[in-house]
């Protein structure tokens, strides 16, 4: 390989490659292995810094105590790999694992669930291995994908799948606090629009959008609606503005949603920052 040998389609199933050194010290990128079969290969203590593997299989291979810093494992079967004490800093497994990609494109629901189950197991192993190395940013991404695979195995119209999707949408299974912030800002803005057209009460005066009013007057009222929406979302309730008519429904919904959204943000943020 170092002398330009063939690196495509190697059949190394069950091969004993203990301590193998494939570090490319003469180039900026690691060696490239394409469509290689390393099923149950023994790669204990191997030096694979920067290795690039595309396609093929590492299924049930033993990479215990190996060095996979900056390795690229794209579209590779990683099911059942032994990751004990494997160095995984900056490991790149692509946007999706091979089983994940195949499961999403599979039309047979039974076979798709098989792919998703294998993908879930692989993501779980990667998550545990990265946690063992203290790489919590990487483990956070893998736990999101693991739980996504678990959701995709559920019946399409089931309550549990819908609930799991909602949790993923709002906070990325506890790994994306910025999603909570964006949802909060979006809800505040949308509710302010409803208040703008449904009206508010201020000091005994009924305020509502009026087409005959000047642009400046309507713009000021829109800002007041935005202020009231923020106050309602955070459940401060100063009492200067009060909802009337349909605005009461939106205010009650916003206050209810805001109370647990703020609590959710605190939980997600603390979880993310204390790792």
Give residue spans per PLM region.
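Tandem repeat scaffolds
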Residues: 1-142
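Alpha-helical solenoid repeat scaffolds of the TPR/TPR-like class and their adjacent stem/linker regions
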Residues: 110, 122, 148-156
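Extended, hydrophilic extramembrane loops/domains of integral membrane proteins
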Residues: 136-154
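Outer-pore turret/helix-boundary of cation channels
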Residues: 186-225
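Transmembrane alpha-helical segments and their cytosolic interface motifs
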Residues: 155-199
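Short amphipathic alpha-helical coupling elements at transmembrane boundaries
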Residues: 141-144, 168, 251
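Pore domain of cation channels
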Residues: 212-275
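Coil-to-alpha-helix initiation sites in intrinsically disordered, low-complexity, charged segments
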Residues: 96-98, 151-165, 217-224, 244
């Amino acid at each position: 390989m170092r002398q330009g040998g063939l690196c495509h389609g190697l059949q190394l199933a069950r091969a004993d490659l203990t301590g193998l050194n494939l570090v490319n010290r003469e180039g900026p990128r690691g060696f490239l292995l394409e469509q290689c079969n390393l099923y149950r290969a023994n790669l204990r203590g191997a030096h694979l810094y920067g290795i690039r593997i595309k396609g093929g299989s590492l299924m049930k291979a033993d990479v215990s105590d190996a060095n996979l810093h900056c390795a690229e494992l794209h579209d590779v079967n990683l099911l059942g790999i032994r990751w004990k004490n494997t160095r995984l800093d900056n490991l790149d497994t692509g946007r999706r694992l091979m089983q994940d990609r195949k499961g999403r494109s599979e039309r047979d629901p039974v076979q798709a669930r098989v792919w998703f189950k294998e993908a879930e197991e692989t993501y779980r192993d990667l998550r545990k291995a990265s946690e063992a190395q203290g790489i919590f940013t990487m483990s956070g991404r893998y736990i999101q994908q693991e739980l996504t695979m678990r959701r995709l195995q559920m019946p399409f119209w089931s309550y549990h799948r819908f609930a799991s999707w909602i949790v993923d949408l709002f906070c990325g299974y506890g790994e994306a606090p910025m999603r909570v912030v964006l949802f909060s800002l979006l809800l505040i803005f949308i509710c302010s629009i409803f208040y703008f057209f449904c009206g508010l009460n201020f000091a005994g005066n009924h305020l509502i959008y009026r087409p005959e009013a000047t642009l400046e007057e309507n713009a000021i009222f829109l800002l007041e609606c935005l202020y009231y929406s923020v106050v309602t979302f955070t459940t401060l309730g100063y009492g200067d503005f009060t909802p009337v008519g349909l605005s009461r429904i939106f205010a009650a919904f916003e206050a209810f949603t805001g109370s647990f959204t703020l609590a959710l943000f605190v939980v997600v943020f603390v979880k993310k920052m204390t790792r």
